[in-house]
Amino acid sequence: MVRAAPRVGLAEVLRRHGPAYLATHALPAVKAKVWRAILACRTAALGGQEQTCETCGATRHVYRSCRNRHCPKCQTRAKEAWLAARQREVLPVPYFHLVFTLPHDLNGLIGQCPRALYEMLFGAVSATLTEFAANPRWLGGTAAFTLILHTWKQDLGRHVHLHALVPGGALKADGTWVPAKPGFLFPNEALSSVFRGKFVTALKLARQACKLQGATVLADHPWRELLRAVHRHAWVVYAKHSLGGPEQVLDYLVYRFLKVLTIRLMPDRTSSTGKPPGRDSSRERLARYVA
């Protein structure tokens, strides 16, 4: 009988493989702070309290949490609060799922000015969806949507994209609801073109307003090269089929977007290379996580 591999949390992975990684990699101050918080979370390092049962007298030690937003152990309550808030917002109508992705040519700039670029992304997507919903050709009303930022893909490489969960309809000025056509919300090619235009405009304005401090592409020549690269690629907006009603939407939110990061350490089934077949070592996955 083969037993399932035990679940090992991120803190344990850092304890086991962190020293070897840190011996050859220097962490920026921000990442080092997160690293220390995850290791200290719910341990004696942060202190705690002793709880005693009034009936049997049994005692236990409860250690404090680090409350760092990157810590998997501390996200359960935040997840539950977020989900409860979204439950109050969901409408009893079909939903659509759209994905707005930034071209990888922007990855270097995103790494240098993440907050500014993420704000531009949210702004461009919000303005695009609002504009299309207000157009009488499509809905002619006020849009509602939930935007969720993802900054990496499954292999932990940088892949910045925004998921949009959009009700199939809009609210007119007189309070009436305008439903979208069955299985159709907005034309994808037009969405992509408008989204790119709004983002690139915001990018140029940010450079003019000196909001990209620290970026290495602000000089005229590298800036023109960046804009040419950005315009070379099609900005595809991916639209998935309708997600159905509120129950399906909430299921999607929970299982797709609120998964807590846990790394499973595989059993010692190694190939001739010393690695589990087809898998990276935990140390390699750790390197991608902190990169």
Range-by-range predicted roles:
Residues M1-A291:
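Detector for conserved single-position "signature" residues within domains
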